[in-house]
A protein has these predicted regions:
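TPR-repeat structural position
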Residues: 17-18, 58-59, 65
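Alpha-helical segment of the N-proximal tetratricopeptide repeat
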Residues: 3-19
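Alpha-helical solenoid repeat scaffolds, predominantly canonical TPR units
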Residues: 23-24, 45, 64, 71
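Amphipathic alpha-helical segments of tetratricopeptide repeats
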Residues: 25-30, 69-77
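TPR/TPR-like alpha-solenoid helical repeat scaffolds
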Residues: 43-47, 76-101
């Protein structure tokens, strides 16, 4: 896996979502593969949803996560060395928790855990 992507994964997993987005912006500008650009844009959107959630905007976060989930299928089960299937599961769990919270079925609005990016062995 490319060193820049590994660094970006570290940023994401440490909750540094704005820096993660910046790292992906620089990677997107250097790739010519449209599928790779689309994947990085998808990951940036996931990070933006998590930023919205950290700001307390559950409704926008829910909408953005739902949109990202619908676009994730074309990159399953792995893409560029990342376990997309595991990320999708994390996002589905988070989306379910957000929906339960908004429906009043869950007392705690904060997620039990945030999605993580997992690097697969080569």
């Amino acid at each position: 896996m490319h060193a820049a992507l590994l660094k970006a994964v570290e940023l994401f997993n440490n909750g540094r979502f704005a820096e993660f987005q910046d790292a992906l912006d620089s990677m997107t500008s250097t790739t010519r593969a449209s599928s790779e650009r689309q994947f990085y844009t998808l990951l940036k959107n996931v990070a933006e949803a998590l930023l919205q959630l950290s700001d307390g905007d559950e409704q926008d976060a829910e909408g953005m996560l739902g949109s990202a989930l619908r676009k994730m299928d074309e990159f399953m089960p792995r893409f560029r060395g990342l376990n997309v299937a595991a990320l999708r599961e994390d996002m589905q769990r988070l989306l379910g928790e957000l929906r339960e919270s908004r429906a009043g079925k869950r007392a705690e609005p904060a997620p039990s855990r945030l999605p993580r990016l997992r690097v697969l062995p080569e």
